[in-house]
Regions:
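A general structural signal for well-ordered alpha-helical segments in protein cores
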Residues: 16, 46, 101, 219-220
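Flavin-binding catalytic cores
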Residues: 110-113, 130-131, 156-240
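A short, glycine/Asx- and small/polar-enriched loop/turn
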Residues: 22-29, 70-77, 247-253
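General small-molecule cofactor/ligand-binding pocket signal
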Residues: 11-14, 59-61, 236
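Helical element adjacent to the flavin cofactor pocket in flavoenzyme catalytic cores
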Residues: 32-92, 96, 278-291
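Dinucleotide-binding Rossmann-like beta1-alpha1 core, especially the glycine-rich loop
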Residues: 1-18, 22, 28, 150-151, ...
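C-terminal catalytic lobe of FAD-dependent flavoproteins
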Residues: 198-293
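Flavin-dependent oxidoreductases
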Residues: 69-183
């Protein structure tokens, strides 16, 4: 119903026989088929956007972490983390700070919730000899008892087939290699009452995800539940992402966009999946809303 309400073309429910015609190695009682579903290369998109910004006279300031955004008299200034104030004044500012969105928003005068709790997700690439077993993208039916979607299959732009991600608490908002931890980030979620309320409600899901973190065999078994021919597939680690999961003080996960206006400053407090894939459409919406003021 949501797909139809949003005008997604061609989406329909199919039975097990048609499922096997579309994905011969996939088992299930039925499926929701979306023939126009697409994937993108986030890296290529980001690189092209950067090129366009520079072509239009814009600047991309690397190694310049933002401390807070200050508004006075209808003008917005950017104060860097070291206290230096950026030399340009803006009439509008849109903050898309991802994993740091709650901190930047609070320092800039917005409220402190929802808070970002980081969850990492590991992807694996399956053995080249098995990638033909899946033709497109296959997702499990979400279990409403658990907060995350589960392991799914994604065919990348380069033709490689990935499975993943799992979902487990990250011991650092920028801990992409999985070999370090940030004590300030750990204290930030461990001292948040909402985190413990969430954890208490989701112990079964936590144990299930922990198995996929410590055991690649468990990870493969999750995927093989609906593509049994991959039960013995070999996998190698691919990318590891960190999800900026917004969480309310009562432990509820925020599953929709949270866009807050604070004067002439707009904070994107939550942008759930598929935020990256849909980033251009989301950007158009945000800019359109800001320009209406």
């Amino acid at each position: 119903r949501k797909a139809q309400a949003n005008g997604v073309p061609g989406v329909r429910l199919i039975g097990s026989n048609e499922l096997r015609e579309i994905e011969p190695n996939c088992i299930g009682l039925g499926a929701l088929h979306s023939p126009k579903t697409a994937i993108v290369s986030y890296g290529q998109i980001a690189a092209r956007i950067a090129d366009e910004i520079r072509e239009r006279g814009g600047r991309i300031c690397l190694d310049s972490p933002v401390g807070r955004l200050l508004e006075q008299g209808g003008e917005v200034r950017v104060e860097l983390a070291d206290g230096e104030v950026f030399d340009t004044v803006f009439d509008q500012a849109i903050a898309c700070a991802g994993l740091q969105s709650d901190r930047l928003a609070e320092r800039s005068g917005d409220q402190d919730t929802p808070r970002i709790v980081p969850f990492f997700g590991q992807y694996y690439v399956i053995d080249e000899a098995f990638k033909s077993h899946v033709k497109g993208l296959i997702y499990p039916v979400p279990d409403p008892r658990f907060p995350f979607l589960g392991v799914h299959f994604t065919k990348r732009i380069d033709g490689q087939m990935t499975i993943g991600p799992n979902a487990f608490i990250s011991f650092g908002r920028e801990n992409y290699d999985g070999r370090s931890m940030n004590l300030a980030d750990i204290f930030n979620f461990a001292s948040y009452p909402g985190f413990w309320k969430f954890a208490a409600r989701n112990l079964p899901a936590t144990l299930r995800e922990l198995k996929t973190v410590v055991s690649e065999a468990s990870f493969v078994r999750e995927a093989a539940r609906y593509v049994p021919t991959l039960a013995s597939v070999g996998i190698v680690p691919a990318v590891r992402g960190i999800r900026a999961q917004a969480m309310e003080a009562n432990g509820a996960l925020v599953d929709d966009f949270v866009i807050r206006q604070h004067g002439n400053i707009t904070h994107i407090r939550n942008a759930p999946s598929p935020g990256a894939t849909s980033s251009l459409a989301i950007a158009e919406y945000i800019v359109r809303e800001v320009m209406r003021r």
